[in-house]
């Protein structure tokens, strides 16, 4: 996303200063919410929550709000996009190494999947992108959080679809309001898209974009609908957005 672009544009000394400024804001939020920082990854981090998934989601929302409240000095005037992805599943944590060089290691298919989701969060404009499996572990998810179904990812090895949620409590106020106002139309559009009713879905995404012209997910769906609805074999297109 934009944050990675900013990091790559800086000289090495400025780059590490910016990364450390960001991590100094992120790590306390993870610690205070009961998370464990497993590793620092590029310009971000991987955190593990072993008990309550709502703590992980609450921390994700807080991370976005924390960074928005205090811009790192090295970012300058450039727009700073920050994205959090959440998945849930089993993980093995152990110590690896030899002699005096030992470190903790986490082995889990879900950490790899979470990393796969990171560019998708930026692509579809989700500050917090969460899998349906993780959301399903939170009681009253739909009532406690503001979220919309973005669509589906095909899990190739498991031959199943995983729902993705854009939890927009982590967005800035105007974006949050616009996503809530257009949520019903957007989700109806996604449902029609998944039913291969591309023309009708297209009309709904146009309505969404009239109200929220910066909606990246709606723009992507509109592009797909414009491409598909004229085709003779349109029903053969997949209902999912990405394949893992």
Regions found by a protein language model. Name each.
Residues 3-6, 96-104, 174-175:
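Short hinge/gating elements
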Residues 1-5, 44-47:
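Active-site-flanking beta-strand signature of metal-NTP-handling nucleotidyl enzymes
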Residues 18-33, 62-70, 211-213:
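Generic non-transmembrane alpha-helical segments
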Residues 238-244:
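Flexible, glycine-rich loop/tail regions that form catalytic "lids" or insertion modules at the edges
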Residues 29-55, 69-109, 133, 158-159, ...:
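Catalytic core of nucleotidyl cyclases, primarily class III adenylyl/guanylyl cyclases
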Residues 91, 122-200, 206-207, 212-224, ...:
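Cytosolic regulatory/linker segments at or just downstream of nucleotide-handling modules
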Residues 70-71, 109-132:
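Catalytic/regulatory signature loops of cyclic-dinucleotide turnover enzymes
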Residues 4-27, 31, 38-39:
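Conserved long alpha-helical elements within nucleotide-processing catalytic cores of c-di-GMP signaling
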């Amino acid at each position: 996303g934009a944050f990675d672009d900013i990091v790559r544009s800086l000289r090495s000394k400025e780059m590490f200063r910016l990364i450390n400024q960001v991590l100094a804001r992120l790590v306390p939020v993870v610690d205070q919410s009961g998370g464990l920082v497993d590793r620092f990854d590029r310009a971000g981090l991987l955190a593990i929550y072993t008990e309550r998934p709502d703590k992980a989601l609450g921390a994700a929302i807080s991370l976005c709000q924390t960074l928005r409240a205090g811009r790192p000095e090295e970012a300058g005037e450039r727009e700073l996009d920050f994205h959090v992805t959440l998945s849930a599943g089993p993980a093995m944590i152990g110590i690896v190494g030899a002699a005096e060089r030992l470190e903790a290691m986490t082995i889990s298919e879900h950490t790899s999947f979470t990393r796969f989701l990171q560019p998708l969060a930026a692509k579809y404009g989700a500050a917090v992108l969460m899998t349906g499996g993780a959301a399903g572990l939170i009681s009253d998810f739909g009532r406690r959080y503001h979220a919309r179904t973005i669509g589906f990812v095909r899990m190739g090895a498991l031959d199943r679809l995983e729902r993705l949620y854009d939890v927009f409590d982590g967005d800035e106020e105007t974006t949050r309001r616009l996503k809530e106002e257009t949520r019903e139309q957007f989700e109806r559009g996604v449902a029609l898209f998944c039913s291969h009713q591309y023309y009708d879905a297209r009309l709904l995404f146009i309505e969404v974009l009239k109200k929220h012209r910066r909606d990246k997910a709606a723009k992507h769906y509109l592009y797909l609908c414009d491409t598909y609805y004229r085709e003779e074999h349109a029903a053969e297109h997949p209902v999912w957005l990405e394949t893992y």
